[in-house]
């Protein structure tokens, strides 16, 4: 629908988040002892049985600029004090996942896997968001006159995502 609207010249855009590119219903939401509540978000994480098609469509959308940006919908909650509020009533589980801290490296993994070009990685995570929020060309580009917001990226750095070493204190 987004591609059709864009083709018709409508000023529309769409986004995705890292969790929809990598997580699956069976591996995350179906964990025992209510652990799956950690992964409740909207829209919901999809089943492994349709995830290949679903996730490959999302990667294709990023490559084809049908999905303009990768955001996070960053909305972290602690499991013990917040997510467990829904133990007896699913509707009381706070809805959301963290994502700001690891967004860049998760989407860079798409570059490593051949899902996205290096240039498109920069566009979806930096340049396009700067344009959308009216900050371009001060932000989102390395050029004379632009702010010198530069990240030195080590493509060989290994990261383990988990509760230890997180910089955001409201998530586990």
Model-derived segments and their meaning:
Residues 1-70, 75, 86:
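Histidine/acidic residue-rich metal-binding segments in metalloenzymes
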Residues 32, 86-90, 160-172:
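Short, surface-exposed loop/helix-turn segments at secondary-structure junctions
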């Amino acid at each position: 629908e987004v591609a059709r609207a864009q083709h018709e010249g409508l000023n529309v855009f769409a986004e995705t988040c890292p969790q929809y590119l990598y997580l699956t219903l069976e591996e995350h939401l179906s964990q025992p002892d209510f652990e799956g509540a950690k992964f409740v978000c909207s829209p919901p994480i999809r089943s492994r049985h349709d995830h290949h098609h679903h996730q490959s469509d999302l990667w294709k959308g990023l490559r084809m600029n049908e999905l303009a940006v990768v955001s996070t919908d960053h909305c972290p909650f602690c499991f013990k004090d917040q997510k467990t509020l829904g133990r007896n009533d699913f509707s009381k589980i706070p809805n959301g996942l963290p994502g700001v801290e690891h967004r860049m490296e998760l989407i860079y993994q798409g570059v490593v896997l051949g899902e996205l070009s290096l240039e498109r990685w920069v566009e979806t995570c930096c340049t396009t968001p700067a344009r959308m929020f009216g900050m371009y060309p001060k932000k989102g580009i390395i050029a004379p006159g632009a702010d010198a917001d530069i990240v030195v990226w080590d493509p060989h750095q290994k990261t383990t995502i988990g509760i230890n070493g997180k910089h955001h204190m409201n998530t586990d």
